[in-house]
Amino acid sequence: MTDVVRDFDALYAKLEAPPHNLRLVLECCAPESGPLDLAAIQERKSYTCCALNNRRNCVLHKCVVVVFGTALDARLRAPSAEFDAQNNLRGTFMLDGRFLSFPNIMMNNNVLMHNFYDKLYAKHCKRMFLYGNVDAEKHINRAIQLVYDKATRRLFARDVYASDYVVTDDLNAVLETYLASSGKWRPLDHLFRYSKAHKQQLVDHIKMIMHHDICYSIDNLANKIIYKHAYLMELLLTSTVLQHYQKRAGENEALKRRLECEGEPPASKRRKAQSVLYGKESKKIVDSVVNGRLIYCVSKTFSKQRRSFPNQHDNCSNNNIEISLPVLKYRVGSEVTRITNDSVRQKMLKQKKDFVKFIGSFFHGEMTVAGKKFFLCRNARLPNVDYAMVADKFAELQQFGLVAPVHDLAHCADGALLIAFNDRPTNLQCARADVPKIVYRLKRDRCPIELKASSNILYVNHHEGMVCIAKRVRIGAPVNASINALLTPYEYHYKNSLFHAPTVSACEIEESDDVRCLMSKLEQYYFAEYTHLFYTIPVPKMIVALTNLKNAMPVLRYSTLGTAPVGLSVAVGDHVLMNNKMVKLWTLVRDSKLMTAEDPYIPHMALPIRLYNHKVNKLKGKLALAGKAVPTLKFVASSGPHNCVVLPDNMVQYFAGTVLSGAKIVWAHDGKRCMVEACTNGAHNVYKVYVFFRRTRNQAVESLAASMTLAGDAVIVRTAVVTSTDDLEGVKVCSVHGQKGVLNRSEDLTEWMAEDGTHAQICLSPVSYLSRQSNFERLERKYVVRGGNHADPRARRYPIFNIPYMLFNNTPDNIYKEFNKKNYTGHEKVEGTRFDQWTKNQSFVGNRLAESLQWMRGGSNLPQNCGEFEVVSSLLMCNNVVMK
């Protein structure tokens, strides 16, 4: 779990502090303007701000994304506490009028050494990139690639010009250059200043480091890094604008000082001040954010792939996630997307053993991207990269005499461990006996530094994208202390880890976990009192419940209901409200006239639930302007109770209003959702706008509203229709047990009455209850008697259970969008359907196998089996048919 708001608060503070000293304002042309309300921000469509320097030049022009809930948001937006609390906006941002979140992104770890296979080399090699050779002009940090073949003990190198060669001692000088100025961890450059003898031994030192066995494959979490949104945003701003701006500001300052020293007056000729310094670069930043391609800051591979395959629309092209309000609590910041290349195979996407307790074990995202979207467990942490902090830690080790300098590898003591930082050779060593003390100094206070050890090397790692888990560690003699530590997947899961080798580190992880350690904070919040279900009922049912939780209609409190959110929502009574996605209903396991066959539920005829549908339509038109004359334009919205009428086909026609225009308007619409009647009145064009919506049983029209906006020559008429109904028949429900079904015809369930007056509110199928292996342990229960006569001792008592449910609704529009507007290729998987080719084939084979074989066997009317039967029966890998 990571806090997006805290991360972005830190980013904004960094922009406003030295050396940048920028001032964040909503508009660079009006920096003193007051805060805007949310409606005005939605009209602007994008919630971004500008960054001004002390000369009031705009350095970052409308490209700094403002995240809702941050201190900057509180400064730029008028307070709307009720709306924020109801919709849980915290951590989201707005672009193109849509609320979006950016997931944490998982990639392969190219910072450290990793297993590597290439046709040019042996099958089991190790690879490492050495960064350096920084080109300050082009802001490029080049890298040479080192590949080590353990079998032959040979080191190969590929330089920045893509030339391959076997490494000899001649490379020592080049290695020193790359290691001494990596450009990535400048506060630690002093670790890579070697003695004269050591400089001649760097190749051997690197071979020693790369000879160490890595016991994880490329798909393991130990070989992954997870980038946070704020870090990628900072990289984008720095690489695109800030790096160049700082360099130019430094040059100007140096020139000013030189002129002052020489006594020369500054040039009298003044150039015209430029208000926006980096217009094109700012536009590039906005495009990167809008297209969800922040990951390109750290990986150029994806941009190359897109250029190579322009027609291929992969799932990685846009990582922004559009979020419908209200947002699931604790979703933002916990969600992780795994980036994969074009040749995605199912085995690449499965989770390895070291994902446990770091990545949620129950929520695996949508079927379309199975294995690529998941959630961080509650105890997982994504720490910030801080090389200055690591430099302070090394200074602390030197202060306590726990490390010593290396002058010559040949003169190192037998009990000494050479220290490597991020798998690079350093000029330090330590004693093996001091490892427990070093662990204490480097790991305490949840310091995000990874420690590994081999027979002669202590690996100290700290880099971007680390993923850790918060644990308590007990360190024995000579330290004898317990510390709060952050452990990486390697440290926590692998038997070769220091924390599973007490003879070396004297460490022991203190464990007190239950099933909640496998769950994200989102799951723990929504299933707070029902976590026991995760280990008492089948896991697939819990996955169903979690998937449906994400897709469920928002649940609102009826007593304080203001404007219903856009789309479908549910308003409920206070006594059945559980959270913003669930309602609690008293459930009785029974059937009536087979009404619960095929999974339907029987609801009570008067449930305290009302469905709301807030439908927004935008009718767009273009003014046919002649010259630069501004046309007269006016919109008169209709009012009163008689502005809608029911048509014979059960549709409702709503008269939205009249547009009066001095110029002709060309409207873009299909005539299905809305209708425009046009006529002329003298020099004016008159357009009457009508909107259609579907009529349902017991429907009440809550509100009808219309408005018009003008942007350039574009006219937009926006209509909002809010309807509600208490008819729940056909609404899909899902319980916390993963029991899906639809609501059937309602019955009067007040005859099933408890002593305190509580009655059953919904009936669950007895067959479904048994077949799904559900249980009602630890659920609130009461006992009811049919008819409510509890004085009768012979009357049978039946238990009812207070079970949370999620509700869904499919309108004809949603069904049309989901099914009819898609081109099926046979490769996609639409959740909850059987439309894909794989499922069709499985179903056909399963249902037809037995009769097909029987038909083949008897088809020839001969006593012996025909050849076709023999062939087909031999091809069956798995079959549940008994052949006699």
Curated annotation (Swiss-Prot):
GO BP, sorted A to Z: DNA-templated transcription
Catalytic activity of the protein: RNA(n) + a ribonucleoside 5'-triphosphate = RNA(n+1) + diphosphate
Pfam families: LEF-8 (PF04941)
GO molecular function: DNA binding; DNA-directed RNA polymerase activity
Source species, domain of life: Viruses
Enzyme class: transferase
InterPro entries, sorted: DNA-dir_RNAP_su2_hyb_sf, LEF-8, RNA_pol_bsu_CS
Gene Ontology cellular component terms for the protein in this record: DNA-directed RNA polymerase complex
EC number: 2.7.7.6
Keywords of this entry: DNA-directed RNA polymerase, Nucleotidyltransferase, Transcription, Transferase
Record family assignment: Belongs to the RNA polymerase beta chain family.
Role: Required for late and very late gene expression. May be a component of the novel RNA polymerase activity induced by baculovirus infection.
Name of the featured protein: Probable DNA-directed RNA polymerase subunit beta
